[in-house]
Regions:
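Polybasic/polar functional segments that serve as interface/processing modules
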Residues: 1-139
Length: 139
């Protein structure tokens, strides 16, 4: 997508991300199949990938679930189901929040202070608004 405003690299504090979109955006239309149109470009949704370093609370399933729920709410998405799996003995957690508009997944390595988070949302949602919620939850 050469010249597209939707692809850029961002580095902010302990969060490094490559994302299609980091700012609230104007959506020209949302089709019946939930595809977005901005200008002349149509796409399935907004995909954000977050790498959190020096993160904390990564072995706390309750904290992770709260962070997922809070980020879903602020993004304007609809939660269908959350499933978290706590690995032992390392304490890492992998989980997914299944949304009517797609998903948020998380994989944590508390022994390294690292979490990988994947947000994909279609329709009239704003996944970029979830980024500060997730940064604050694990910062």
């Amino acid at each position: 997508m050469k010249g597209s405003p939707f692809l850029e690299n961002v580095s902010s504090g302990n969060v490094r991300m490559r994302t299609q979109d980091t700012q609230p955006r104007r959506i020209d239309s949302v089709s019946d199949d939930r595809f977005l149109t901005v200008g002349t470009e149509s796409f399935a949704g907004i995909h954000l990938l977050l790498d959190l370093w020096d993160a904390s609370g990564l072995d706390d399933a309750d904290l992770i679930e709260r962070a997922l729920r809070d980020s879903i709410k602020i993004a304007g998405a609809s939660l269908l189901h959350i499933h978290l799996h706590h690995f032992t003995p390392s304490g890492g957690i992998s989980g997914i929040a299944v949304l009517a508009e797609s998903h948020i997944s998380i994989h944590t390595w508390p022994e390294r202070g690292y979490a990988a988070i994947d947000l994909f949302m279609c329709g009239d949602t704003h996944p970029e608004l979830a980024v500060p919620v997730l940064k604050n939850a694990f910062g």
